[in-house]
From Swiss-Prot:
Gene: sarT
Keywords from the named record: Activator, Cytoplasm, DNA-binding, Repressor, Transcription, Transcription regulation, Virulence
Protein name (Swiss-Prot/TrEMBL): HTH-type transcriptional regulator SarT
Domain of life assignment: Bacteria
Protein's cellular compartments: Cytoplasm
Its job: Transcriptional regulator acting as an intermediary between major regulators SarA and agr and virulence genes. Represses alpha-hemolysin (hla) gene expression.
Disulfide bonds listed in the record: none
Species this protein is from: Staphylococcus aureus (strain MSSA476)
GO MF terms held by the record: DNA binding; DNA-binding transcription factor activity
GO CC field: cytoplasm
Organism placement in taxonomy: Bacteria, Bacillati, Bacillota, Bacilli, Bacillales
Family note: Belongs to the SarA family.
Matches recorded under Pfam families: Staph_reg_Sar_Rot
GO biological process, one term: response to stress
DNA-binding region, residues: 55-78
Amino acid sequence: MNDLKSKSNIKLMKRVLTTYELRKYLKKYFCLTLDNYLVLAYLDVFKNDEGKYFMRDIISYIGIDQSRIVKSVKELSKKGYLNKCRDPHDSRNVIIVVSVKQHNYIKNLLSEININET
């Protein structure tokens, strides 16, 4: 039983170390936080023809605290990765809008991150 617990602890520590290294790597080479990366990855994976995403869907899918995603979207908007606006039909909803040019930039950036990370 202790052997199984030890192996589980080792796996957990490896994941923590990998996450820590990824955070440092993103910050140093791309000026991104891990939360920024997760939002950009979401936008790439769930790309759609309209380039529109609801903030609540991003928060729900990524599964981390809402305030962290809101902060990340604000940072990414300031850097030009995306635009955000209120839903004209329901002002409580925030819509993330990504142009074709922005999508291409995000896709290239994520490819560069994945190539350099390996």
